[in-house]
């Protein structure tokens, strides 16, 4: 068994788990997440915890039990606390503005960039150079943040572009004559 899968997923108060043969649904105060069951892993509810075990002793099944456990833990944290990713815009004239489920970006192009947010993801702009992406699905929040960052990734000489708040951009030295 994977070392990760040995630890059970603790279910906090206010979170309900329903396990069927085909899928696992986790419902909490922030929303509901549904994930299909993996054929090589059994998931059982043991009181206030979820336990993942490999169906057989194969290496792939044991490895997947740890992966499934981590995904279930992300689901539980997502529906109870939620996830957020912060982005910073560095550069002259770089601005962001949230309008409902759309994010308007001015990134130095000849045209404004409009990014449509998927269902289940909210965007806020506390200032013109800050973007906060929130949601219950960790993978979806990270994917949206990566898509926004990809419009203008930080360049290595001045560091201008869209970056994660915790990202460190290593700057290159300019060419000397």
From Swiss-Prot:
Keyword match Ribonucleoprotein:
yes
Q: Among its keywords, does the record have Lipid metabolism? A: no
Keywords of the record, alphabetical order, are:
Ribonucleoprotein, Ribosomal protein, RNA-binding, rRNA-binding
Gene Ontology molecular functions: rRNA binding; structural constituent of ribosome
In terms of superkingdom, the source organism counts as Bacteria
Gene Ontology annotations for the cellular component aspect, listed alphabetically: cytosolic large ribosomal subunit
Q: Which InterPro entries match?
A: Ribosomal_uL6-like, Ribosomal_uL6-like_a/b-dom_sf, Ribosomal_uL6_a/b-dom, Ribosomal_uL6_bac-type, Ribosomal_uL6_CS
GO BP terms, alphabetized: cytoplasmic translation
Pfam families recorded: Ribosomal_L6
PANTHER family in alphabetical order: 60S/50S RIBOSOMAL PROTEIN L6/L9 (PTHR11655), LARGE RIBOSOMAL SUBUNIT PROTEIN UL6M (PTHR11655:SF14)
Entry similarity comment: Belongs to the universal ribosomal protein uL6 family.
* Role, per record: This protein binds to the 23S rRNA, and is important in its secondary structure. It is located near the subunit interface in the base of the L7/L12 stalk, and near the tRNA binding site of the peptidyltransferase center.
How does this chain assemble? Part of the 50S ribosomal subunit.
**By what name is this protein known?**
Large ribosomal subunit protein uL6
Source taxonomy = Bacteria, Pseudomonadati, Pseudomonadota, Betaproteobacteria, Rhodocyclales
């Amino acid at each position: 068994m994977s070392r990760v899968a040995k630890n059970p997923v603790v279910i906090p108060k206010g979170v309900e788990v329903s396990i069927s043969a085909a899928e696992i649904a986790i419902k909490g105060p922030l929303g509901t997440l549904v994930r299909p069951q993996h054929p090589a892993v059994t998931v059982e509810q043991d009181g206030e915890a979820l336990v993942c075990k490999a169906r057989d002793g194969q290496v792939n099944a044991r490895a997947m039990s740890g992966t499934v456990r981590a995904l279930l833990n992300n689901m539980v944290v997502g529906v109870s606390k939620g996830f957020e990713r912060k982005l910073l815009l560095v550069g002259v004239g770089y601005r962001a503005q949230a309008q409902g489920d759309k994010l308007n970006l001015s990134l130095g192009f000849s045209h404004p960039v409009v990014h449509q947010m998927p269902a289940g993801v909210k965007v806020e702009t506390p200032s013109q150079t800050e973007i906060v992406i929130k949601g219950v699905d960790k993978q979806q929040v990270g994917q949206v943040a990566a898509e926004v960052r990809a419009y203008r990734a930080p360049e290595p000489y001045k560091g201008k572009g869209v970056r994660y708040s915790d990202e460190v951009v290593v700057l290159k030295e300019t060419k000397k004559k």
